[in-house]
């Protein structure tokens, strides 16, 4: 009887240790989804997200479609939900195309956040936002104005697609600023590269050939901006102001050769980190309503702002925008200080 009791105790102890081990292994899991894989900008964001995951003891999976499509992102969202992920952070290719899948995920208890490019606010809890449309639209025009020093000028807009949320918001604000502050600037065309490097280069060359007297290309897209710079070099257009948003590692050779005088962005590695820290706060049931702040190691304090900062009319408890602390203009003097 005593031996039987000892065996039972040993078995229960072993079971308890096994259960404890399983509990330790069952780390929370977060999926971090870009618009597409294979683009340095998104890879850098994913690196930041995974660094934050390691610091927090959270399993962060970086995966995205090979082409920027709603169907590709929806499939990934559904797969992650079915695999039992606790949170999904997505850079949406469409403001409303992902909403049915994201709402289903939320109904199943999955925390949904967006980064880089937002959905409609009712389809997520928080948007980790690089800058308001007004901030980024103004930044684009101001960079162009630093180089276009004449009253009458011809300007082209060139970016990823006519449906992507973030870039269209920035361009809308940029065009409004041009209309108000540079009425002599003519916007001669708005064209798209659809996040494809080859198509972007072809489109950029087509713009430059079609408008030989073009003064500036404004390209707020990680593929479009280097494509515009490469097109200008291929066609030997040295007098063209080329500005926009991309990563310093991609743009460094164009800046060093003088093809691009300045361009902007934000620290996308930092954006990935903030996204995971905010998701972790949600999973830990920390207060995250408008006005609440979160201290992030190595970054500082970030605060939840209302959706109205982004021009939305939807507000709800547990819903808002977390704005990155700063944006950066890169040029010859500072570009080598950055590595992403």
Curated annotation (Swiss-Prot):
Its main location: periplasm. InterPro entries: Bact_Solute-Bind_Prot2, LsrB, Peripla_BP_I, SBP_2_dom. Induction: In the absence of AI-2, repressed by LsrR. Induced by AI-2, via release of the LsrR repressor. Pfam families: Peripla_BP_4. One of its GO terms (biological process) is transmembrane transport. It comes from the Bacteria. Keywords: Periplasm, Signal. GO terms for cellular component: ATP-binding cassette (ABC) transporter complex; periplasmic space. Residues 1-26 form the signal peptide. The complex is composed of two ATP-binding proteins (LsrA), two transmembrane proteins (LsrC and LsrD) and a solute-binding protein (LsrB). Belongs to the bacterial solute-binding protein 2 family. Part of the ABC transporter complex LsrABCD involved in autoinducer 2 (AI-2) import. Binds AI-2 and delivers it to the LsrC and LsrD permeases. NCBIfam families: PRK15408.1. This is Autoinducer 2-binding protein LsrB. It comes from Salmonella typhimurium (strain LT2 / SGSC1412 / ATCC 700720).
């Amino acid at each position: 009887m005593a031996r039987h009791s000892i065996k039972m105790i040993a078995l229960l102890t072993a079971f308890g240790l096994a259960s404890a081990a399983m509990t330790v292994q069952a780390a929370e899991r977060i999926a971090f989804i870009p618009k597409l894989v294979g683009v340095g900008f998104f890879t850098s964001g994913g690196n930041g997200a995974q660094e934050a995951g390691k610091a927090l003891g959270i399993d962060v999976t970086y995966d995205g479609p090979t082409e920027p499509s709603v169907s590709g992102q929806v499939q990934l969202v559904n797969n992650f939900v079915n695999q039992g992920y606790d949170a999904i952070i997505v850079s949406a290719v469409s403001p409303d195309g992902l909403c049915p899948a994201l709402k289903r995920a939320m109904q199943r208890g999955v925390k949904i956040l967006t980064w880089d490019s937002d959905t409609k606010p009712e389809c997520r809890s928080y948007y980790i936002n690089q800058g308001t449309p007004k901030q980024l639209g103004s930044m684009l025009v101001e960079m162009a104005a630093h180089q276009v020093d004449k009253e009458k000028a011809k300007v082209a807009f060139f970016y990823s697609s006519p449906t992507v949320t973030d870039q269209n918001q920035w361009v809308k604000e940029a065009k409004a600023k041009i209309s108000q502050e540079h009425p002599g600037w003519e916007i001669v065309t708005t064209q798209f590269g659809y996040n494809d490097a080859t198509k972007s280069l072809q489109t950029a060359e087509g713009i430059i050939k079609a408008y030989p007297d073009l003064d500036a290309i404004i390209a707020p897209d990680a593929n479009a901006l280097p494509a515009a710079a490469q097109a200008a070099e291929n066609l030997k257009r040295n007098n063209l102001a080329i500005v926009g948003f991309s990563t310093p590692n991609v743009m460094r050779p164009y800046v060093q050769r003088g093809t691009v005088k300045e361009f902007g962005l934000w620290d996308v590695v930092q954006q990935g980190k903030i996204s995971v820290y905010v998701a972790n706060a949600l999973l830990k049931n920390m207060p995250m309503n408008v006005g609440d702040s979160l201290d992030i190691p190595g970054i500082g304090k970030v605060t939840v702002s209302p959706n109205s900062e982004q021009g939305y009319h939807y507000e709800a408890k547990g819903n808002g925008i977390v704005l990155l602390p700063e944006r950066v203009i890169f040029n010859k003097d500072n570009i080598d200080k950055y590595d992403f």
